[in-house]
């Protein structure tokens, strides 16, 4: 199907990526219905913010329990709509349930007013909800990303209006059902297309967006026009520095897992593998051994280790990047061809000697294609890591920890992992710099994004 159908159509549509067949459709909303939903949410939010924090988090904890109890029901739907491996869909849901429990435990303490000594008899800050948070979320983690923004916002007393990707309506509808069963009346789904996004932004008090940098610029522009607090989690082209004293077996295994998990469709995946001369050949050999073990196939089957891409246009875009790289001097060590047959499959592709002449050097590669960059030395490796418009995450593999930490401080990224692939941890803030966005999700920092930190001062 044409990309425009997914992006601009008022119809929400599930298409099985493993076959290319349409399996479900639902109509979108009118702007009038959107305005009615916003008005209804505002009424509920006024009551929700007045509830004791212990009651709010009890319902969030109940949501986590419901997700845990419904993994077997939800995971196949995510696999059907997104195309991800069934065990990866289950892992997404299990992590989301832990998110609910984490904030249910944390929020009551973090949202207590804080006393700050000044010349006043009493002064400090309180944490109050902003109101309604409107979120535009992508398709690749339809439950995790929806709740990564919503759970802390709800705990703080906000209401949440979610615009899901138009290709995951069934996953989203099931999430809404669990929200209602948990007794959370201040979460709703806006079944709208992009033409109605500005109306939603204007009607709400803050905006959260996860997706491409290009769309993020549009969201930021609309939010700025209406002076709305915004958190943007955008694209990434995460570098991984493999230094001369790295544990190559571990680095190769984890780089392959990070790059090809979820068919490479993660903003936080390892995408640019930067090697120094001393270990380049040995690392490549170990990495290719991991890549050749990947088995494409039906994502529902336990033996499959490489899933299809989500849409045909995403596969076309990735293949164009790979073809361009080969045309500009990169060596294709594996993959690089669109396979025959149904579905949106693309083979695990490794491009060696990717240079600045290649589009994939500068652009985010959202699929199973790894770029190998050759650095002259460690300083050059850091230069290559920073030679990108993105700044989401990065990793450094070295057994010399002080040196690895020193290099990590020079990398322009929202997070740097040493001797581990980039990932997100509930207890740590997640977000980027540069064209990867601003604001943070997860941890206490994610909780404070959508509150009014109100100063109080008493004579």
Language model regions located:
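N-terminal Rossmann-like NAD(P)+-binding subdomain of aldehyde/semialdehyde dehydrogenases
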Residues: 1-121
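Conserved C-terminal structural/oligomerization subdomain of aldehyde/semialdehyde dehydrogenase
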Residues: 19-25, 241, 295, 327, ...
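Residue-level signal for inorganic ion chemistry
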Residues: 20, 56, 78, 100, ...
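Short, well-ordered beta-strand elements within core beta-sheets of diverse protein domains
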Residues: 22-29, 44-50, 135, 240-243, ...
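Structural signal for hydrophobic packing residues in well-ordered secondary-structure cores
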Residues: 45, 49, 64-67, 71, ...
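Rossmann-like NAD(P) dinucleotide-binding subdomain of oxidoreductase/dehydrogenase enzymes
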Residues: 114-250, 375
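A short hydrophobic/small-residue beta-strand
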Residues: 159-161, 332, 415
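ALDH superfamily catalytic-core signature
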Residues: 183, 214-355, 418
């Amino acid at each position: 199907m044409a990309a425009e159908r997914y992006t601009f159509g008022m119809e929400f549509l599930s298409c099985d990526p493993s076959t290319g067949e349409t399996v479900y459709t639902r109509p979108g909303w009118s702007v009038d219905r959107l305005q009615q939903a916003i008005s209804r949410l505002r009424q509920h939010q006024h009551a929700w913010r007045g509830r004791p924090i212990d009651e709010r988090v009890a319902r969030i904890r109940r949501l986590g329990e419901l997700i845990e109890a419904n993994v077997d029901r939800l995971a196949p739907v995510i696999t059907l709509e997104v195309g991800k491996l069934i065990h990866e869909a289950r892992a997404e849901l299990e992590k989301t349930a832990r998110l609910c429990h984490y904030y249910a435990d944390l929020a009551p303490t973090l949202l207590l007013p804080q006393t700050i000594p000044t010349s006043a008899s009493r002064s400090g800050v309180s944490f109050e909800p902003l109101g309604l948070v409107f979120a535009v979320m992508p398709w690749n983690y339809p439950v995790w990303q929806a709740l990564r923004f919503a759970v802390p916002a709800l705990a703080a007393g906000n209401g949440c209006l979610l615009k899901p990707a138009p290709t995951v309506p069934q996953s989203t509808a099931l999430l809404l059902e669990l929200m209602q069963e948990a007794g959370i009346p201040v979460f709703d789904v806006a079944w709208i297309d992009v033409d109605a996004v500005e109306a939603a932004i204007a009607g709400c008090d803050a905006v959260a967006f996860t997706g491409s940098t290009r769309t993020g610029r549009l969201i930021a522009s609309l939010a700025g026009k209406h002076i709305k607090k915004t958190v943007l989690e955008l694209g990434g082209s995460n570098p991984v520095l493999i230094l001369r004293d790295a544990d190559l077996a571990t680095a190769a295994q984890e780089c392959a897992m990070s790059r090809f998990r979820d068919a490479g469709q993660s903003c936080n995946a390892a995408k640019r593998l930067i090697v120094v001369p001393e270990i380049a050949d040995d690392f490549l050999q170990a990495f290719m051994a991991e890549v050749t073990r990947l088995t494409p196939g039906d994502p529902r089957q336990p033996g499959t280790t490489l899933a299809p891409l989500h849409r045909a246009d995403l596969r076309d875009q990735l293949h164009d990047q790979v073809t361009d790289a080969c045309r500009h001097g990169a060596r294709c060590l594996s993959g690089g061809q669109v396979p025959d047959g149904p579905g949106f499959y693309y083979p695990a592709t490794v491009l060696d000697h990717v240079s600045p002449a290649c589009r994939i050097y500068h652009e985010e590669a959202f699929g199973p294609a790894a770029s190998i960059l050759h650095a002259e030395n460690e300083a050059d490796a850091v230069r290559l890591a920073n030679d990108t418009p993105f700044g989401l995450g990065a990793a450094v593999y070295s057994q010399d920890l002080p040196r690895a930490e020193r290099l990590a401080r020079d990398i322009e990224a929202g997070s740097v992992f040493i001797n581990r692939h980039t990932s997100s941890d509930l207890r740590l803030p997640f977000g980027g710099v540069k064209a990867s966005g601003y604001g943070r999700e997860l941890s206490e920092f994610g909780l404070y994004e959508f509150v009014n930190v109100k100063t109080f001062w008493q004579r």
